[in-house]
Amino acid sequence: MVKYFAGDWTVQELAAIEQELERQGVQYTIDGEELLVHDDHQERRVDMIVESITET
């Protein structure tokens, strides 16, 4: 499992990240201020998604 701190993301950023994760079939959970990605092998893909959405 890979953890991302989502507390600094806006509501819009989090919604966009969730939408993209769902579109790509990445299994995840939101737990408080953490985004938990269930498959360690998806880490690089999720990194790219998060970076592309939060750096705009």
What are these language model-derived features?
Residues 8-24:
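Short amphipathic alpha-helix segments
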Residues 1-7:
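Short glycine-/aliphatic-rich beta-strand segments at the starts of folded cytosolic domains
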Residues 9-10, 41-43:
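Residues that cap or initiate secondary-structure elements
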Residues 42-56:
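Charge-rich, low-aromatic oligomerization/scaffolding segments with amphipathic character
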Residues 26-33:
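Short, well-structured beta-strand/strand-turn elements
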Residues 33-40:
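A generic structural motif
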